């Protein structure tokens, strides 16, 4: 893989950029302090802005590593982060990345997450040269699965009691897209966009 690190990506409505420590108040206010956002995630709700600040200190310190990918999701009309998306696992030999994301509830059901996900997937395939992009979700959080399907990812199955999140031991539904499948996947994405399906998180 040709690692590029976290470079700025622009879409129609979004700027995906590196976090700065100055983003801590927005991170805390817009999503990290909301238990509804973290319900099916693996990290606890932030109890103070200081926790958000410490997380961002850690992330910003890792940006010098070209294998570290963590973007702030910034709507152009707002100008501050409303969520995050990044690579939570990568495998050099298999040439794959696993993507995780979260976004504040005020921005659910507007297609923001899928727009960010599609942009990061394109970046991983075109710039980094991965062969496989994958992600997973708790089946009790079906809107996350809709994000993956909207981006053309294929459902590969649900592994029973194979994962853990803030609800405890849970099932995990897996989705993935291979480089060789992208053309057909883009046809699916175009169809969904034509039909204006935006019922994701």
Regions found by a protein language model. Name each.
Residues 38-58, 69:
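Conserved GNAT-fold acetyl-CoA-binding loop/helix
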